[in-house]
Amino acid sequence: MSDEPLAWETLERRVAYECPGFEIVREDARLPDGTVTDFDYLSEGESVVVLPLTPSGDVVVVEEWRQAVRRVNRALPAGGLEPSDGDVDAAAHRELTEETGYEADAVERLTSVEPANGFADAVFHYYVARGCTPTGEQSLDDDETIRVDTAAFDDLREAVRTGDLRDGRSALGVMYYALFGAEGATG
């Protein structure tokens, strides 16, 4: 293993494109060998992905139209952190309630990942939510159309295996929990 430095030095950062939910950022950077290059990436901030378990052990899932792939997508509740959240745990509670109308007795962080750090700065924080019960109405964003359902955990795991659960965030959450369960929780 070489001791050569790997870090790039950011010389300039500018937003090339901005819209609700993300930005395209262009940076001028100096590589360790002195070469100056430009680098574009998607900047979308931190998000939470929640695996909500009902008292009977079923998983609360959402079905949502995804315009980019032009189909209904079955997924775990997920969304970006908001300034009013206070902390990531609060964001997990909020997203669960907003998207599903369910509330959890407790949330526990499973893991955090950078799903595409070659071209995006996104961080997904995964949570398991226990004791989830329907307590109210959804509070959806203007551009969300979401239907709520429940599914057996084993059915979701099988859907990942067969390719029927195609949402990458959700597939990772289901498989992480299948592999590590509560013992994989980090806080």
Please identify what each model-predicted range represents:
Residues S2-W8, V72, R109, N117-H125, ...:
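Nudix hydrolase/Nudix homology domain
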Residues W8-V49, P55, E64:
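Acidic, metal-coordinating catalytic segment for phosphate/diphosphate chemistry
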Residues V15-P20, D85, E114-F124, A182:
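Acidic pyrophosphate-coordinating catalytic loop
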Residues R26-D28, P52, V128-R130, A152:
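Short, well-ordered beta-strand micro-motif
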Residues E46-A78:
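A glycine-rich, hydrophobic loop/mini-helix early in the fold
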Residues D58, T133-G136:
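Short helix-loop capping/hinge motifs at secondary-structure junctions, enriched
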Residues L76-R109, Y127, D143, A152:
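The catalytic Nudix box helix
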